[in-house]
């Protein structure tokens, strides 16, 4: 097919060269250029340059296709990684929200516990203060009674010493001694 095309082109281009006159004249530059061109095309065809160029173009097209496929695969992998990282980021965000919610709940529970502990501490201190007040009252009442008894004894001593004679005092002492002897034996 290529050979037929080359011959047809040669015949089509040589007729204007012959029309210029003179036949096969090398002085005609158009004819020389056509011959050089045909010789160049013939050499290219003989060396199978078109098939080599075709192979190189096919190889380059194949390498471009493989690069495109590799780029497409890398893009899909990147999209998969991006989706994976987005899911992980959402999971981390949800976990952080759970941690914050748990911390808030624990803080609220700790605050409630602190309130309860404070109320219990206040109640204990109030009870201790009431007990101290009751003890102080009892101590004050005892001191007042003891003082009243002491004063009463002193007053009674003064009254008895003013009203009692020595004979009456001796009778009371003897009676007290007999009473003690009776209780001891």
Swiss-Prot record:
Transmembrane annotation, as ranges: 4-24
Residues forming coiled coils: none
Topology with respect to the bilayer: Single-pass membrane protein
Entries under CDD domains matching the protein: ATP-synt_Fo_b
InterPro entries the record matches: ATP_synth_b/b'su_bac/chlpt, ATP_synthase_B_chain
Compartment list: Cell inner membrane
Keyword list, A-Z: ATP synthesis, Cell inner membrane, Cell membrane, CF(0), Hydrogen ion transport, Ion transport, Membrane, Transmembrane, Transmembrane helix, Transport
One Pfam family linked to the record: ATP-synt_B
GO cellular component: plasma membrane; proton-transporting ATP synthase complex
GO molecular function: proton-transporting ATP synthase activity, rotational mechanism; proton-transporting ATPase activity, rotational mechanism
Family designation: Belongs to the ATPase B chain family.
Self-association and partners: F-type ATPases have 2 components, F(1) - the catalytic core - and F(0) - the membrane proton channel. F(1) has five subunits: alpha(3), beta(3), gamma(1), delta(1), epsilon(1). F(0) has three main subunits: a(1), b(2) and c(10-14). The alpha and beta chains form an alternating ring which encloses part of the gamma chain. F(1) is attached to F(0) by a central stalk formed by the gamma and epsilon chains, while a peripheral stalk is formed by the delta and b chains.
Stated role: F(1)F(0) ATP synthase produces ATP from ADP in the presence of a proton or sodium gradient. F-type ATPases consist of two structural domains, F(1) containing the extramembraneous catalytic core and F(0) containing the membrane proton channel, linked together by a central stalk and a peripheral stalk. During catalysis, ATP synthesis in the catalytic domain of F(1) is coupled via a rotary mechanism of the central stalk subunits to proton translocation. Component of the F(0) channel, it forms part of the peripheral stalk, linking F(1) to F(0).
Protein name, per record: ATP synthase subunit b 1
Organism ancestry: Bacteria, Pseudomonadati, Pseudomonadota, Alphaproteobacteria, Rhodobacterales
